[in-house]
Amino acid sequence: MLVKENIESNSFPSVEAMLASCRHETPICCLRQERIKNNARFFARTFPGKVLYAVKCNPHPLVLDACYTGGIKDFDVASLEEVKLVHARCSSSTLYFQHPVKARSAIRNSYGRYGLRHFAVDHHRAAVPLIRECETN
């Protein structure tokens, strides 16, 4: 699927054809969902460990959908907004809040509202506020 001017369209057979149809200087976002899905499938099948998609790389909903349908069911999130986005689209996914700096409200909401149970810390002292916020829920 190619996206032109934020409108989903399958009417362009290639990126070149889409670019040729443009007569103005606005940015164009092209997403190749099949390519993303096939790459996700390759990683999910051949990597020996658990494969996570880092939402920070590209949080576009069509990218998340392609990763999910390609077999990547778990996501590395770095903010409460990313938690909300993935939860809304892929509610059965396991999320991993890997960013080492997290606001207490982000911890509390991720744990209490969205059921996150996987958090990363970069030092044992950072675990104290994490544990406190999780215990209050």
Where are these regions (language model features)?
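A charged N-terminal "starter" segment
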Residues: 1-137
